[in-house]
A protein has these predicted regions:
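Short, basic, alpha-helical segments at the C-terminal edge of helix-turn-helix-like DNA-binding modules
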Residues: 31-38
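Hydrophobic/aromatic-rich alpha-helical bundle segments in the mid-to-C-terminal region
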Residues: 78-82, 109-155, 162-165
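Helix-turn-helix
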Residues: 1-24, 28
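Hydrophobic alpha-helical connector segments
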Residues: 28, 43-72, 125
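Amphipathic alpha-helical packing segments from all-alpha helical-bundle domains
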Residues: 38-42, 72, 81, 87-113, ...
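Helix-loop "lid/cap" segments that line or gate small-molecule binding pockets
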Residues: 64-71, 79-86, 155-158
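Histidine kinase transmitter module recognition
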Residues: 17-18, 51, 69, 114
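Short, structured helix-loop boundary elements
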Residues: 1, 23, 27, 52, ...
């Protein structure tokens, strides 16, 4: 909490007063980031219902704003990378994450052969986005249209056998 308070114009005592603990603060921050990501996907998901367009084109039309949203928020991605892969996430926020994604999963499940698959495939997409964003943040990759398309192709080719056309 000292480092958090040091980065913000507030006293450490306010963190405890408002959240009770550092863990509760991190969980609330994770919840906010999670909801923002899900809302962004839901905002653009209607493109998947455009049956007159080929599947890959529809998926790419959904991909572009999701990728732009993700790479445009480096602080959120850094936070996700630190928290999502932590033991605290497993004990404090895993169920919250699943609740946050229920609406998205319900919507996406109609595009997959099995609703069970949609949970695992959503996690795969999310974790792939995090992974490639981390490579961009570290300078290993540049945020270019070519990289975006390569990541899209990797994800799409992985999902394609599980998708309904």
């Amino acid at each position: 909490t000292k480092s958090i308070a040091g980065e913000l114009p507030c006293n450490e005592v306010y963190i405890y007063r408002n959240f009770g603990s550092k863990e509760a603060l991190l969980q609330a921050a994770f919840n906010r980031a999670d909801i923002g990501f899900v809302q962004n996907v839901l905002k653009h998901i209607d493109v998947m219902d455009e049956a007159d367009r080929p599947l890959e084109e529809r998926c790419h039309a959904l991909w572009d704003p999701v990728w732009t949203f993700s790479v445009g928020r480096p602080d959120i991605i850094r936070f996700y990378l630190r928290y999502y892969y932590s033991a605290q996430y497993l004990t404090s926020a895993h169920e919250l994450h699943h609740r946050n994604y229920q609406q998205l999963q319900a919507r996406l499940s109609r595009y997959f052969r099995s609703p069970r698959d949609s949970w695992f495939l959503m996690a795969h997409v999310f974790e792939t986005i995090l992974s490639f964003c981390s490579h961009i943040l570290s300078g290993e990759l540049e945020n270019t249209a070519e990289v975006s398309d390569e990541v899209f192709q990797l994800i799409f080719r992985t999902l394609q056998p599980y998708m309904l056309t």
